[in-house]
Amino acid sequence: YLRKWLLFQYTDKVVSWTLLAVYLGTNMLYYTFHEGNMSHIYNFCFASVLLYITQTWHTKPTLYKAILLGIMGGMLTLIRPINILMALVFLLYNVVDRRTATQKLNMLWQYKHHLLAAVVAAFIIGFPQLLYWKHVTGQWLFYSYTNERFFFTHPRLLEGFFSYRKGWLLYTPIM
């Protein structure tokens, strides 16, 4: 679906080389064949579908596409709760200035029933997880990364980029 989305903007040759570079120049190959139980590939897959459906909905809005957007958003949020921010991709798609922001708000208002359907679809996808958390922890929302935290006052940018342990640029040089 990433290919289909990229073909809206670029030639087939450019898209093919780009996808090859992403596949070989990032951790995608490793996570595809060696760590298939990790969430990364599923996250990439659902995000790619979300991008494609976002483009097609903006080209020709239909209720079916809106429901698919909700399903993709729900699945992305299940994979990683922070992925709920992917909704911003849909909401801000092609917004570049105040004029396009106003046009987008008008479009979203015109298709508010599509937005409602997307939210309901996402909720239906996510509700079993909420029930599970309620049953197991007694809370509707549960933060499962209890030992993880952010270090905003002491960022380790150089280590994050170049460390041999988890260096972003070391293991994904194409970036």
For every predicted segment, state its role:
Residues 42-73, 89-90:
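Specific aromatic-rich, kink-prone transmembrane helix
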Residues 2-26, 45, 60-68:
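Transmembrane-helix signature of polytopic, membrane-embedded enzymes
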Residues 19, 65-80, 87-91, 123-124:
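Membrane-interface alpha helices of multi-pass inner-membrane proteins
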Residues 89, 93, 112-175:
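Membrane-lumen/periplasm interface segments of specific transmembrane helices
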Residues 63-65, 103-120:
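Membrane-interfacial entry segments at the cytosolic side of transmembrane helices
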Residues 30, 64-72, 153-161:
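Alpha-helical membrane-protein architecture signal
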Residues 19-49, 53, 74, 78-83:
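Aromatic- and kink-enriched transmembrane "portal" helix at the membrane-lumen/periplasm boundary
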Residues 7-10, 53-59, 92-102:
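Structural signal for the C-terminal ends of transmembrane alpha-helices
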